[in-house]
């Protein structure tokens, strides 16, 4: 069984596109091979800035022979029908078989297709993959029609086995497949002939090309850590930057430098962001001081001076960049110390959304809402309002203009320079959080108040102008904002009536529709934590469903009890009681909720169930009143055994109508006991 090696060698592939391109190449080729009848043992895709490669082991040498039977017209059908059938099968009349059918004799065509050699199939599949490759952006070059991310120079397409290797005959736009590639652009630019994947990977390594992106990442991570350790520093983790840099180099050579003393007073976030965004440097931190004092740059070449010239050049560019940052910082500090009034005035001319006014209008709404929310989260109301009014002023600062990702972070520095209390400054930094499902959730009361007000103003505002998420489209990130509100409420245990809060934020918003949207997002959030959607539906029908903390406490307690054997059996009993009642009420035209009388109990099982309900109902009610849903669910679970025994021993639909009605009313008590906690009829199972 041969192995297949493919390499597509081109000019530099953007780093951000490489991971997806590896997956696309593997899928396009392997799916095409399997569809054509070939199988394989394993496949792996690789990338460097100048190449995409695919190695497939254990490919079958040819596709299997196939035999297809096709039913045609009756033997006495008109000649035109027979001729059409012959054209569709490519056979002659003599090659058809007449067979008996329930409608008479019918022509059958048996079409045998011999297997095709792997090389023929590979050539077709690879050409189609190259022409249909889904690059996010592509280009044409020269006079050809082929599109690729950057000009494509050469193709390796090689089948190899124990007897040797052969090039698959293939040519695309004048580029013929071969068995040669090139090494590192500067250190080993000559052609390299290869005979298979192992030979290919080994020769590339000797030619200063590290083929595996994961290996390049590991090499950068380890060497950067070693360089930092030698100076008593540590590398600030940044997996996104690591992945990007690994896609920029074929032979990573990390080099470490120090930041000039005159820049060390800049906030560490400014240093880190400037170095990352402008130069793709990793930041090195002094663990004793917390300051960013050094950097690691990753060269793509080994030099006789061990990178000294490269490092000096990078330090010159870095000094220029940090000089700009220092200029922004100094100017911003002067404005902050003056009270930031000019920034506040400037936001009047910045439109937030055409129907929702300026950023200044938005800030006024957030401040008013933060004042309302403050008591719910235990925040100082004056500080919450003050924090809301200054939290977005850094949007007008020069630093945030240069580095938008520093919004909020710089706001804290400027608030402190303005002499504002630390809780107010912290809220300026934290009010955008959480930005995603894994982002940290603020816990300081003032920060929580402003973060909630910010997100709720956004949500109620867009609901008021009917700009809601639709399908996969969510241009204003409203789903993320709703998840942020949910996490802020749940993590901090904030007891808020969302319906009332929506009305205070924006009376013209459709509060019921927005609450339904929150419930949908809550289902997604809890599903990730192992709570089923039907359990959420069951508790949503209960009073207080706009208090998310209350709702989640109910749902998690119910989810826990339903995972037990008692809970599973109890659910069956409650659902059975509900189903029997629903059928009887529909048939009799009455609602059985008149109260069952124990004096009509004929069996021990009935009397036991009466006693169990008499004991459980008040305990469940009290537990629900105290919001102790663990105790409430344990109370309902205590009914499992008497309910099971009742259904086992008692005939509900007795011929004696007095007994029948009493037993149905007893079932009503069971249903009502369950409804103290949830609508069990909505739970699957």
Swiss-Prot record:
HAMAP family on file: Gly_tRNA_synth_beta
GO molecular function, one term: arginine-tRNA ligase activity
GO cellular component assignments: cytosol
Residue span of region Disordered: 58-77
Keywords from the UniProt entry: Aminoacyl-tRNA synthetase, ATP-binding, Cytoplasm, Ligase, Nucleotide-binding, Protein biosynthesis
Catalysed reactions, semicolon-separated: tRNA(Gly) + glycine + ATP = glycyl-tRNA(Gly) + AMP + diphosphate
Protein name: Glycine--tRNA ligase beta subunit
Subunit comment: Tetramer of two alpha and two beta subunits.
Family: Belongs to the class-II aminoacyl-tRNA synthetase family.
PANTHER family: GLYCINE--TRNA LIGASE, CHLOROPLASTIC_MITOCHONDRIAL 2, GLYCYL-TRNA SYNTHETASE
Subcellular location: Cytoplasm
